[in-house]
Amino acid sequence: MITFQNVNKHYGDFHVLKQINLQIEKGEVVVIIGPSGSGKSTLLRCINRLESINEGVLTVNGTAINDRKTDINQVRQNIGMVFQHFHLYPHKTVLQNIMLAPVKVLRQSPEQAKETARYYLEKVGIPDKADAYPSQLSGGQQQRVAIARGLAMKPEVMLFDEPTSALDPEMIGEVLDVMKTLAKEGMTMVVVTHEMGFAKEVADRIVFIDEGKILEEAVPAEFYANPKEERARLFLSRILNH
């Protein structure tokens, strides 16, 4: 479904992603972990061309993302993204935030979009917040609205870029619970996170990246019990003993 072939990304002289080769299948939950500044968020953001690549080929459902002829807006309709900071419109209600893209992009009628928005608010556990404004919500609730907004476009894949790192500790669980439900329902998910418990429980595969390179890929049980790379062992010992 998503394929990186010899992908490289530079910021000027800084080589951010180095020869990335990665295949993500439909229905798979892939968690990308690694130290800060390792390139994991950049890798994620290349999937919907929020970041462009300099070399190599990146395809989503057979469409080359980096081809100039590709209609990236068409591709993005099938890719939901949830950011660290929620990016909700402060002057629109929760319902209006979720309805916006289905009406503008999918050309749904307002009635249909409203029904879709209410359905996904129910799914993320906050149906009673439809008429609230973002400022009236906790961080966890805002992030759940952001997830509902992504789902309302009925994407084929959801990207999560450190979705819990801006949240207070007691709100992290409510967001992870929603993500666990999505994973169980078969949503293709690519997640950048420091939530090791979530990765262990939900991931089909863990990808460890450091200094722009994929150093290790493994199923969680194997990765946690016996990481092959010394750098991965060091990272895990620091994170798990923190």
UniProtKB/Swiss-Prot annotation:
Single GO molecular function: ABC-type amino acid transporter activity
Induction: Positively regulated by TnrA under nitrogen-limited conditions.
Positions of ATP binding: 34-41
Disulfide bonds: none
SUPFAM superfamilies: P-loop containing nucleoside triphosphate hydrolases (SSF52540)
Main localization, broad class: membrane
InterPro entries hit by this protein: AAA+_ATPase (IPR003593), ABC_ATPase_HisP-typ (IPR030679), ABC_transporter-like_ATP-bd (IPR003439), ABC_transporter-like_CS (IPR017871), MetN_ABC_transporter-like (IPR050086), P-loop_NTPase (IPR027417)
Name of the protein described by the UniProt record: Glutamine transport ATP-binding protein GlnQ
Source organism phylogeny: Bacteria, Bacillati, Bacillota, Bacilli, Bacillales
Gene behind this protein: glnQ
